[in-house]
């Protein structure tokens, strides 16, 4: 089977935004206009194609990233068919991991903003993630028909809150109830969509006279932005020559791919206006797989190598999502970066050093499947039946082994205890939790050694609620859920040198391990910094090389148990600088125990402290309620960072608040403001807990 679409006509894009900006509705319209969906699904009817889990349809939010493929030839059929692989990502902050995972494998992103709410907290989070992976992006300002819609205010917010350079390539004609269509600033024509056929057809018309001056002004901004792409264009522009439509588009494309500018369009997905123009922009301004930075990986000998987006190169792909399908079992979504692979081929997973055979390969359309025989560079597909692959692992050609960069996943910040209601639920619960943990790397399962309880941990209350609900729905497991627990951590504040000795010599073969460690605190506020570092500085064979990894292991085991209240220690640099051994009695176990003892004693001497997770909280409230909201945040040990005006006449309060004080906040905020305020929060950092809080927690859980 040969490739049907050339690689330069591929677009791998994500559609991301804040919850409720109209992201899934936009994707539904894309599927409708590209001919994949014969009836438009509305999220408020619970019928959206991309929201295929029952909980998504009930709650009207998107939880998992559904992937789909469609083809587009342009509004005026001006292109050859382009293959667009779309990933619809969740906008709720508890599911940020899904967004991060998608951006890692995408080449471009369409960020959907609400015309009346503008840039919201989750938008900023998504923007930072897209910056991290250098993903070129465009913006679709949706809901232009909503009360309070203001396109130009949103353009200003994109500059001020996202630090981006927006370049509107369309202007709205009217707003709120009077929103009629858009002005195309490149063609300098008005576009009106036909409401009778759900916007399938449209007409180009003259720009309304009252908007001509505004259109001319924004057109000049657009042309100036395009001219900055190259010196030749700038010279042409400065000499007063007109730039052609093709020159403007090519220049905007170059600057978008370099992440210099962000093209902006507008419309109303719900009212079927403006979505086809978004597809045109995806084709014109988003990169093909050949136009992004080539993927880097590490070969078996430790050297780095780039893999080109080319069918002739050796096969290399990244598994970015595992999902359990009720009909076929485990689906492994993967993005092919280079090479091709057929059904039945062997693939190698270098992370687990395992070889597996690719059974069936399917192209996903939301949750329906089409079997395909072969996938090519640039494709996003799903494999059925891979047993040993988890999120973020590489699949490659067994004859050309490479490990692509792994994805980093955040530590969970909230835990609850779950227990099965009946004996029958007990066995099923183990299987269910195992499958859910394989799907979602930000979800952890562990058993509390003291109480024997099963503890599940995740990124927020909604995250855990939905996982418990999925156990009930998909695996028929009924369980009782305990109160939420905060994931505290421990740290040291001073540098110490400490000796660890483990000696047992009472007849026969004994045990002998002796180490000297230097323990130093590390900065844990930096996201990029490691939370543990081990350095071996022993010289002259004071400890044989083969025992050094055992010391490291002993230190890490003790760190996972903590020294104050049983919470893991973070931010320790441990340097092994001396020690001694016994020719007969020394072994790995003895040195592991010696390392563990030294770590425990040293941490207790190094001014240990308790850390608590602190959340970044943003509250949108009417001005009349500001005093109540600020007072309540102060009572919750919150630190108010600032207040600013938000769209829609609201005020935005920015604060840092310990997670332990935020349980039940949604209910309290609703009652304090008669339901008119809303908030969002995301994990910000670990910070030292106050003396009073630390004493309360340590006395309840003392481990010494």
Curated annotation (Swiss-Prot):
Localisation per UniProt entry: Cytoplasm
A Gene Ontology BP annotation from the UniProt entry: ribosome disassembly
Binding annotation for GTP: 17-24, 88-92, 142-145
Keywords in alphabetical order: Cytoplasm, Elongation factor, GTP-binding, Nucleotide-binding, Protein biosynthesis
Gene Ontology cellular-component annotations: cytoplasm
UniProt-listed PROSITE patterns: G_TR_1, G_TR_2
Domain of life from the UniProt record: Bacteria
SUPFAM superfamilies in the cross-refs: EF-G C-terminal domain-like, P-loop containing nucleoside triphosphate hydrolases, Ribosomal protein S5 domain 2-like, Translation proteins
InterPro entries to which the protein is assigned, alphabetical: EFG_II (IPR041095), EFG_III (IPR009022), EFG_III/V (IPR035647), EFG_IV (IPR047872), EFG_V (IPR035649), EFG_V-like (IPR000640), EFTu-like_2 (IPR004161), G_TR_CS (IPR031157)
Pfam families, alphabetized: EFG_C, EFG_III, EFG_IV, GTP_EFTU, GTP_EFTU_D2
Domain tr-type G residue range list: 8-290
UniProt keyword Transcription, yes or no: no
Coiled coil ranges: none
Main location: cytoplasm
GO MF annotations in UniProt: GTP binding; GTPase activity; guanosine tetraphosphate binding; translation elongation factor activity
Family indicated by similarity: Belongs to the TRAFAC class translation factor GTPase superfamily. Classic translation factor GTPase family. EF-G/EF-2 subfamily.
UniProt cross-references to HAMAP family, sorted A to Z: EF_G_EF_2_B
Function summary: Catalyzes the GTP-dependent ribosomal translocation step during translation elongation. During this step, the ribosome changes from the pre-translocational (PRE) to the post-translocational (POST) state as the newly formed A-site-bound peptidyl-tRNA and P-site-bound deacylated tRNA move to the P and E sites, respectively. Catalyzes the coordinated movement of the two tRNA molecules, the mRNA and conformational changes in the ribosome.
Protein name in UniProt: Elongation factor G 1
Species of provenance: Pseudoalteromonas translucida (strain TAC 125)
Gene for this chain: fusA1
């Amino acid at each position: 089977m040969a490739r049907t679409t050339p690689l330069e006509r591929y677009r791998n894009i994500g559609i991301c935004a804040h919850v409720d900006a109209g992201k899934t509705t936009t994707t539904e319209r894309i599927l409708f206009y590209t001919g994949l969906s014969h009836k438009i699904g509305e999220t408020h009817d619970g019928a959206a194609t991309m929201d295929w889990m029952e909980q998504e349809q009930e709650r009207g939010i998107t939880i998992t990233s559904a992937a789909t493929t469609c083809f587009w030839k342009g509004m005026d059929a001006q292109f050859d068919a382009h293959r667009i692989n779309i990933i619809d990502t969740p906008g709720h902050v508890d599911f940020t991991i899904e967004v991060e995972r998608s951006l890692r494998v995408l080449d471009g992103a369409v960020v959907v903003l609400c015309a009346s709410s503008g840039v919201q907290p989750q938008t900023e989070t998504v923007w930072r993630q897209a910056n991290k992976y250098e993903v070129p992006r465009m913006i679709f300002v949706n809901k232009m028909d909503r009360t309070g819609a203001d396109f130009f205010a949103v353009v200003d917010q994109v500059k001020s809150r996202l630090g981006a350079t927006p370049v509107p390539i369309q202007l709205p004609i009217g707003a709120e109830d009077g929103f009629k269509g858009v002005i195309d600033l490149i063609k300098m024509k008005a576009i009106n969509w036909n409401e009778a056929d759900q916007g399938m057809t449209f007409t180009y018309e003259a720009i309304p006279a009252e908007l001509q001056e505004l259109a001319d002004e924004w057109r000049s901004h657009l042309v100036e932005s395009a001219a900055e792409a190259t010196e030749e264009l700038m010279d042409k522009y400065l000499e007063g020559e007109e730039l052609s439509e093709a020159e403007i588009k090519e220049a905007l494309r170059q600057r978008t791919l370099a992440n210099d500018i962000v093209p902006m369009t507008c419309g109303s997905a719900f009212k079927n206006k403006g979505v086809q123009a978004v597809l045109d922009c995806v084709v014109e301004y988003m990169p093909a797989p050949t136009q992004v930075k080539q993927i880097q990986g590490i070969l078996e000998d430790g050297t780095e190598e780039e893999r080109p987006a080319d069918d002739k190169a050796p096969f290399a792909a990244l598994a970015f999502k595992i999902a359990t399908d009720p009909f076929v079992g485990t689906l492994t979504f993967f993005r092919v970066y280079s090479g091709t692979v057929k059904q039945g081929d062997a693939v190698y997973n270098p992370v687990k050093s395992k070889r597996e055979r690719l059974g069936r390969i399917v192209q996903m359309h939301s949750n329906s499947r089409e079997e395909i025989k072969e996938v090519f560079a640039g494709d996003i597909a799903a494999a059925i039946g891979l047993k040993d692959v988890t999120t973020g692992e590489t699949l490659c050609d067994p004859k050309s082994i490479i490990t692509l960069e792994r994805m980093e996943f955040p530590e969970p910040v909230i835990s609850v205890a779950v227990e099965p209601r009946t004996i029958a639920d007990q066995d099923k619960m183990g299987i269910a939790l195992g499958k859910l943990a394989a799907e979602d790397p930000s979800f952890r399962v562990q058993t509390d050694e003291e109480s024997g309880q099963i503890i599940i941990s995740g990124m927020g209350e909604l995250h855990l609620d939905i996982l418990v609900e999925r156990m009930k729905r998909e695996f028929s497991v009924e369980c009782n859920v305990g109160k939420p627990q905060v994931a505290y951590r421990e740290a040291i504040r001073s540098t110490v040198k400490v000796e660890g000795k483990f000696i047992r010599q009472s007849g026969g073969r004994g045990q002998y391990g002796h180490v000297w460690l230097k323990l130093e605190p590390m900065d844990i506020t930096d996201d990029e910094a490691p939370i543990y570092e081990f350095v071996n500085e022993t010289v002259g064979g004071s400890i044989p090389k083969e025992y050094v990894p055992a010391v490291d292991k002993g230190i890490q085991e003790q760190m996972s148990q903590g020294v104050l209240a049983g919470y893991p220690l973070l931010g320790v640099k441990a340097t092994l600088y001396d020690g001694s051994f016994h020719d007969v009695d020394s072994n790995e176990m003895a040195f592991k125990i010696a390392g563990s003892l030294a770590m425990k004693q040293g941490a207790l001497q190094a001014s240990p402290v308790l850390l608590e997770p602190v959340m970044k909280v943003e509250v949108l409230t009417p001005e009349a309620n500001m005093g109540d909201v600020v007072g309540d945040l102060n009572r919750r040990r919150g630190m108010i960072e600032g207040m600013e005006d938000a769209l829609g006449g609201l005020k935005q309060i920015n604060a840092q608040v310990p997670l332990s004080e935020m349980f039940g906040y949604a209910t309290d905020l609703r009652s304090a403001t008669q339901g008119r305020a809303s908030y969002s929060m995301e994990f910000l950092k670990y910070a030292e807990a106050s003396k009073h809080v630390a004493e309360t927690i340590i006395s309840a859980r003392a481990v010494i």
